[in-house]
Design a protein with these regions (language model features):
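Short loop/turn segments that connect beta-strands within beta-propeller blades
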Residues: 3, 44-48, 83-87, 119-122, ...
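Short coil-to-beta transitions that initiate beta-strands within beta-rich domains
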Residues: 5-28, 50-69, 89-106, 112, ...
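Generic beta-strand structural signal
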Residues: 26, 43, 67, 75, ...
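Conserved beta-propeller blade signature
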Residues: 31-33, 71-73, 107-108, 116, ...
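Loop/turn residues immediately N-terminal
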Residues: 37-40, 47, 77-81, 112-116, ...
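Aromatic-anchored, glycine/proline-accented short structural segments
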Residues: 146-201
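Intrinsically disordered, low-complexity segments enriched in Gly and acidic/Ser/Thr residues
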Residues: 186-240
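C-terminal closing repeat unit and adjoining cap/tail of repeat-based domains
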Residues: 222-265, 272-273
Length: 273
């Protein structure tokens, strides 16, 4: 069993057959990875791996990792943790957190109690849907879009109104592909905006969609069967295989390489398609 602070080789970083990974992020030559129940790890340019979360509670569950201006943010079941210069900053609110993003000088996080917001180093405030779990969000010029436990909500800044779209399924991930709003349902569905003011909930047989990741113009779907790329076939949104053979939970890219967090195969690396 791996102990906190133990350095590990990059070739066999840990018992990769038993460690599931939920999130991966690249920061130059640094690679961060989170394993539910096992902590957060960092690989440096020398190829060594370090357990960096030994200061954090043992029962901590990391939902997502994010990077911004050299800081690592861990969205966890006990709040938003920040890692910088080898030290962790405790969350100001012990509220389960699922996503963190910035917009200018302001920050947003999705929580068990809606969407929260702060500017600069000010206090966090609830801004939308405090009665629902919000899993993900998109902040675009005209709209603020939430994926929550019952579906999707859209705030129109021009009309100052919210529109709620109950879908009968929680939406845990959001992105945009060629004008379509896309989401991942908590039951493994792909949620597709139909450009007609509604959404279609699409199932792909025995494939379960975990999350959607945008890279440039491409959108990738992490699934229980592997990694897929979103595209069109006969005018319909579909998924094209990129890398199959193991469940992929998250991806990130750097310098022409793609890094995949997997459930049973550790952190996998391949050339960017």
């Amino acid at each position: 069993m791996m102990e906190g602070g133990e350095t590990l080789s990059k070739q066999t970083p840990w018992d990769w057959m038993t460690y599931p990974f939920s999130s991966v992020k690249t920061d130059g030559d640094l690679l961060y990875a989170a394993s539910p129940g096992n902590g957060i790890y960092c690989s440096d340019e020398s190829g060594g791996w370090q357990h960096i979360s030994e200061q954090l509670p043992a029962e901590l569950v990391v939902n997502r990792l994010q990077l911004n201006q050299g800081k690592l943010y861990a969205c966890t079941n006990e709040g938003l943790y920040t890692f910088e210069d080898g030290q962790w900053e405790q969350p100001t609110h012990a509220v389960p957190c699922y996503q963190y993003k910035t917009s200018g000088q302001c920050s947003f996080m999705s929580t068990d109690y809606g969407l929260w917001h702060r500017c600069g180093d000010g206090a966090w405030h609830k801004v939308a849907y405090p009665e629902r779990k919000v899993y993900d969000f998109l902040n675009v010029p005209q709209f603020l879009i939430l994926g929550h436990e019952e579906g999707i909500a859209v705030y129109d800044r021009f009309t100052d109104e919210w529109a709620d779209f109950p879908l009968g399924v929680g939406v845990t991930s959001l992105t945009v592909y060629q004008g379509h709003l896309l989401g991942a349902g908590e039951g493994g569905e792909l949620i597709v905006g139909n450009k007609g003011g509604g959404f279609d909930v699409v199932s792909f047989g025995n494939r379960l969609v975990f999350t959607l990741i945008r890279h440039g113009r491409d959108v990738y779907a992490c699934t229980d069967k592997g990694l897929y790329r979103i595209g069109y076939l006969c005018g319909q949104i579909t998924m094209f295989a990129v890398k199959l053979g193991f469940p992929v939970t998250d991806v990130d890219t750097h310098d022409g390489q793609m890094y995949m967090a997997t459930l049973f195969e550790g952190i996998q690396q391949m050339d960017l398609p």
